[in-house]
Amino acid sequence: MDGGIEAARLKHPVIMTPNNYVYLDYYPTMNTQDEPLAIGGYNPVEKVYSLEPVPAVLNEQERAYIIGAQGNLWTEYILSNEQLEYMLLPRLAALSEVQWTQPANKSWERFQNSLSHIISIYNVMGVNYGKHIYEIAAKYDVPTASEGKVVVTLSTLGD
């Protein structure tokens, strides 16, 4: 992001491509032993969706120079069209939503719910999307000594 911020401050048009958000050749899941070979890194759908391409550190005039964001999929490890689709989808849907949704209107929960519809379109089209979005995610609260219990919440797509 630093390079894009500097360019905007110098009044250059900027397309943001921060690798930790939009490099789609990174693994889309932590379960890499079942994944096709990738360059490394970890970039799940939720991380792509969390991108805010217009950094808050810029003033209003500087923000005008941020004209968008771009996803990158370097293909040195991509061996087929099916693998290319797998690495792109549904992360490309998340990046699209980042681009056309105002930050105040973004909602990860709403986007997760819309993924069910998007996936039905992928199925009709016969494209190979990443099924890792169905993995079960666990969240937990660390208890205080007085509580003596741990609350674990399990969720998956649309739940």
Language-model regions, residue ranges each:
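Substrate-binding groove of N-acetylhexosamine-processing glycoside hydrolases
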Residues: 1-158
